[in-house]
Design a protein with these regions (language model features):
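Hydrophobic membrane-insertion alpha-helices, especially the h-region
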Residues: 6-20
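Early exported N-terminus immediately downstream of N-terminal targeting peptides
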Residues: 46-97
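Flexible, solvent-exposed short loops/turns enriched in glycine
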Residues: 32, 157-171
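N-terminal, intrinsically disordered, polar/charged segments of Gram-positive cell-envelope systems
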Residues: 25-49
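Mid-length scaffold segments of soluble, non-membrane domains
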Residues: 86-154, 159
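Positively charged n-region of N-terminal signal peptides that target proteins for export
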Residues: 1-4
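Solvent-exposed residues in well-ordered beta-strands and their adjoining turns
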Residues: 53-55, 149, 161
Length: 171
């Protein structure tokens, strides 16, 4: 059932993008920009992203960012399997926010890091990103955002709902 819901959600997002692209010609640059903005807003209302900001760009901070990503993903994924829409996903993330923060801090401490971690549901800007066959335009999206230390390093992101998070964990 969950797989059907994810496939249906992705199909709706793809169809929205295809219709928006067809209804605007690239020759009319203003219309093309408006089309992209409309498409992004439509998609943004249907997905919840996951964003982890590293403390810095040092190799150690970048490595622990990935470990936090994996630990939080392993913790929250079983709860998200029951979610059938973005509202349920958002509620589940909120219900488990204290544990998400605790898992993040425990992962940092287990790897010898003394800086902290915070997490929140927020709206933030994302660049264009492709997950498998699906490309999401740059723009502002709702996200579970985890900040490690100063949050000044390169970050990692994915789509939490529908769950596309671990299709590409190399970037």
């Amino acid at each position: 059932m969950r797989k059907k819901i994810i496939i249906t959600t992705i199909a709706i997002i793809s169809l929205t993008a295809a219709i928006a692209a067809k209804n605007h010609t690239p020759a009319a640059n203003t219309n093309s920009i408006a089309c992209t903005a409309d498409m992004q807003k439509s998609i943004a209302g249907k997905i919840l992203r996951f964003h982890v900001l590293a403390n810095s760009d040092s190799e150690a901070d970048q490595n622990v960012k990935k470990q936090v990503r994996d630990a939080v993903g392993a913790y929250i994924e079983p709860y998200l399997l029951e979610c059938e829409n973005i509202e349920e996903t958002r509620a589940t993330v909120n219900d488990h926010m204290d544990e998400i923060i605790a898992v993040s801090k425990e992962t940092l401490a287990a790897n010898g890091f003394t800086y902290g971690a915070s997490a929140e549901l927020t709206h933030t800007d994302f660049p264009e990103k492709t997950y498998g066959d699906y490309t999401f335009p740059e723009g502002n999206y709702e996200a579970l955002e985890i900040t490690l230390g100063d949050g000044a390093g390169h970050n990692w992101w994915c789509v939490l709902y529908p769950n596309l998070c671990f299709l590409d964990t190399t970037n």
